[in-house]
Curated annotation (Swiss-Prot):
Involved in cytoplasm to vacuole transport (Cvt), pexophagy, mitophagy and nucleophagy. Works as scaffold proteins that recruit ATG proteins to the pre-autophagosome (PAS), the site of vesicle/autophagosome formation. Residues 1151-1224, 1233-1249 have a biased composition (Basic and acidic residues). The lineage of its organism: Eukaryota, Sar, Alveolata, Apicomplexa, Aconoidasida. The keyword Coiled coil applies. Belongs to the ATG11 family. Residues 1151-1249 are annotated as: Disordered. This is Putative autophagy-related protein 11. Possible candidate for an effective malaria vaccine as determined by epitope response in sera. Keywords: Coiled coil, Merozoite. The gene is ATG11. Residues 16-49, 117-324 form a coiled coil.
Amino acid sequence: MVILGDEKESYTSYCDKNNDILISKQKIEDLKKSIENLLNDKNAHYELNHIKRSLNELDIYTKNKSDLFNNYNLNESLNDSYKDKTFEELKSQLIKQKNLNSCLSLKLKSIHIKLNNLFLKKNEFEKTINNKIKEIELQFLIIQNVTHENKGIPISKELKEQEKHLQNSHENVAIYDTHEIENNDKKKLYTNFHNEEKDHLKCLLEEYSKTLEIYKMGKIQLEFELKCCKEKLNEEIEKNNNYNNKMKSYEIHIDVVKNENCKNLEELNDLKLQLEKTKSENNQNYVKNKILNDEKNNLDKINNDLKIKIKNFKTLLNDAQNKEYILNNFTQKIFNIITYLKNNDEHNFLNDKIHNKLDINQDQIYVQTELYIDIISSSIRNLINFKKTLEERNVELEKVTHEMKELRKELILKKKNYEELRLKLNHLECVERDSVKINSEKEKGEKVIYELKEKLDNDEKIINDLKKKNSYQVYKMKDYEKRENNLINEINKLKLFIEENKMTVERGNEMNNKKLEEMKQKNKELINNLNDISDELKNCIEQVNSVSRNMANVEKEKENIINELQILRMKNDTMRKRISKFVEQEKVLKFKLYTLNNDIFSKNEKLNDMQKKLNDVNEKYKNIVECLNNYKTEHKEQIEKKIERINTLKQNYYYLKKEYDLKNKELEKNIEHGKKLEHELSHCYEENQKLNEEIKRRNSFIKNKDRKIDLLTNIENELLKKKEINNIKLMEKQNVIKNNEQLLKDIKDENEKMNEHVNKLQNELIKRELQNKCISKDIEFCKKEKEDKIKNLEDDLLEKKKCIENLKDELINIKKKMEDKMHMTNEMDLLSNKVEELNRINKTYEKNIVELNNELDVIKKKLNDEEFLKEEEKKKNIDMVYKIKEYEIQIKEKENEIDSLKKNEQNLHVLKNEELNEKEIILKNKYDKEINMIIEQYNKKIQEEKDMLNNKIKSMDQTHKNQIEEMQEENKKELKRLKNVCDMNLQSQILIKENEKHMQEKVEEYKNLLKQKDQELKNIIQEYDERIEIQNKEMEDIVNDCEEKLKQAKINNKKLTTATNMANNNNMLMDENLKEKDKKINDLMKDMEKKKEEINKLVEEKSKLEHSHVKIQNEMSLLVEQNEKLKEEMGLSRIAIKDMEEIKKDMEKYEEEKKKNEEERKKNEEERKKNEEERKKNEEEKKKNEEERKKNEEEKKKLEKDKHQFEEEKERMEIYEHQKEDRKRKDKKKKGHSSDKEEKYNKKEKTKEKSSNILFDEEYIIQLEELRDTGENCFIYLKSLSKELDVIINKLKSKDDALLNDAFNKINLAITSWNIFNEENKEGDNITTVENTATEGNITIDENTTEVEMNNEEVYKIFSVEKYDMLKKEVGEKVECIQKLIG
């Protein structure tokens, strides 16, 4: 016998002992070494226990680590992440931890695979041990049968020799009687012969006593051997108990697999949480869009309010302008009055008080008007007084005038002639002088105009350069302003977001701490509940195992009873033979038994008493046997139901496995598709990184350009500073303009208004040009007239010379008029000065542009410091709003000034004399033309800039639209992907529900098994009762035969009353034989009492089983209730986890939005290309889907074929069961028949022995076939496992973690589905269990052969022990290769 090491310490005991053990790298290395040693050594049981301990330590370490990690991360990471670490660092750490966890999971899975291989080896050793035990038992049974046969032979030989001797003695007695009648003389010879016969009988008695002693010694030896065998059986029972403990450990391993399924459930819950995260993100985006729409509506309201205010402001401006217009008209009228008074002021009353003109440009217009009104009132008073004096003088003058009139009339007539001549001469002289002056002034004007043109050209060049720079700087300013505004908005949002996040994080931390404390308490309670549940489950499992043990013991006792019954039958046969011999002896010794009738009657009475006792015992025994038979019938019915249930479950399992394989294939395809998408995302991420690098390069290039621009601007500043030496006063005004950052916008508005004014001036200039053309025609006509007049007046010159002297006085007056004309030229000089001032203003604008460039550099620096000055910027924004309002006021003031300038220009045109109109018109035409040219150029540039800006705006709108469309497409794709994920999650949930249903079905199956075992006990008891009834009937027949023979013997004894002394010796022998029979009857009675006690024990055990069954049902109901409570608590924990994950999502969203805003601009062109590629991929995927549909149809056809095969096998099994039942019926018929005759009985015994040998041979053949089937199943399973190991090695080389996890899951599912750990519970059962294993073997072969497409005959051809060993070596090498690849 092979005795394994102590295997009493189960998997659960190590879990209870090693809860406080920490794990290090050394333990993992020790675990690897122990696995390698186990692969090399077959009987290293200590190392197997060490592996179990290390696995428990790993599980405990992972649980403790996960709890600590969750608690620590919830409390620590949220508080410290803002202080020290960035999001990217945390993300990298999380990725590293995930990689470590994945590596540990792979190592654990490899260890589990190795353990499964070790358990397979162990199971093989156990099978070999069990086979050897069966062989030993069979040998032992054969030895028992042989010993019984050997014992029967010498007894029969001795009996035959005794019969021969008795027959010879009977013949001799008959001869002696004849001689006694004939010859009385021969008495002496008879006495001598009789003495010799006595001596011979004594020798026979001594020999018979020796043989009895030898038989007793043999019986003692057999009893000793039986005790030894019982001890061995007890040892084997203990081993079976150890194996049951191992089965418990295997069940715990199954619980570990269930825990893995729970982990998969948790992963599904994580996916659900991710879906909820996406939903929350969409909701947040929806809320943000709502907020933006509300802000838009608010801005629209504000704009409408501003528009209304602007309208009101415009109405006020119009009112003010009207008032100013009235005031200006009033001032003009006053000024006209003053001029009139001044012209008529002969005594110069007003020269000291009134100036030449109102200074409208001054700020004190209203004060001047009041002064002028006061002067006018005083002058009017003086005029009234002067008028009174004049009236008095007029009266005196009228008298003198009458006298003078008469004289004047005479002088008038004379003067008329002279005046005509004077006028002509003066006109000619004036024309000559004017022509000379005009020529000189033209030359001077042309020089001045040439110089001004040159200056204007230079100024235009400078202005164009500055405008180009200005436009570029303005464009930059706009970009920077936009960036500033965007940054300010983002910073404000960030502040609000950070504050909100801080509040939410603090609240979340408080809530999470409370929830963690509650969860810890709940976990403690759950752990206590789970420990109680595990203890109760252990007790239930122990009770079930005890039931199974009791069943095995009952079956063994049943076999022992059958063997003892056979032994009793053999003894009964020997007793019958002996009784027949004694009857013959009675016939021979009838004459000797007459004296012993009294003794025989007394002994017959004793026998009758014994028979009554035996009948009572038999009745009790019959009742017990009937109960046992009832139990046996019920047990048979339960077994049949169980077989039918198992067959249906196998069918369902077969179909579910096929469907599961199909779903696994679909999952693999979806996983591959997901990996492709991940690969594409990684590719996009790499491209984005490249684009970011290019952006950085371009930014550096732009910075270099900005530096060059700064250098150029510094050079320009140095050149301009040289020019600014003479313009120190204007620099003071620049300091005011520096603070006004939005002057450029105001200038544009002013330019638009100036354009309108210029258009008006252009219209006026066109009118003036028409007037100048008319005047030029008049001048030519006058020139012609002058030439004609000159010819006529040459003759009259002589006469004019005389009149020259009289005209000198008039020339003096003309000089005064010329002085007045010179005053008008001074006014022209003032206009030229204004032009120069405008040029200076342009220069100041140029300087402002340079300063703005400097300010841009300052702004760039400020942008880097804006994170620390966010609150100050808010205040600045408020100040900017006030400044904008001030600028608007200044713009309005400037508009008023422009209107005043327009009115002044109109007044200047009125005040000019007719003589200077030609000069002014010419100069104005030239000046206006130049201004128009400048304005047109400026307008063209402005329009070009506007077109450029509009084009840019359109391009930006198009890009934004494209981006929005692309974002929508991406969202659609993400929605599709999420839908697919949801479908996958739903499928996984369906699988989980199916697993739960399967677990409930298993619970129901366990309940049904308990019921079936109860019925099996009843059936066994019924069978036992039936057999005992048959035996009782046989015993009654035997007793009846004995009674009939005794009656015949009594009749014979009455006839033989004349017996001699020879009968005394025979009576002694009979007494000894009767004593021996009494001893045997007492032994049988003791055996019967023992069997009664055993039956009572069985009844008690049955009652205990019923109580345990009730307890198990109650415990199952409690477990169901606790399960529901656990589900509710899991739901609460999931809600808490969701809250934490939503906080993390918000943080992740914020950072993702930042990245997206930067990356969206660059992805536009790339996404267009991707769209085209995706279209192609979609077409390819459609083709693949069509191919997959075809494959699915083919697989469905295969499933139908498999169904037909399964039904055929079921029919075979039914045929086999019918054959078996026929055999049992034949056996019962053979056992039921018995006859009175000895020859027929012996023949039937021989036939029974032959039939028992045939049955034994058949059982032995079935066991060999089972061994071969299990070997073939292992061979096929190892083939499939080697293929999956090849897949794992390839995936490890390619390092695809997701595919590896899928492969490991498949192997675990294959191991659990093949039921390695549950097949060996049924090895010690009867032929029914053999049939179940055979059917399971056939089913597993059929399932595997559907994949490999093999038949049973092909497996028989391929299978051999050498190939099986080769496969084992290959699988071990592949496991070592995987171990090396893992590390």
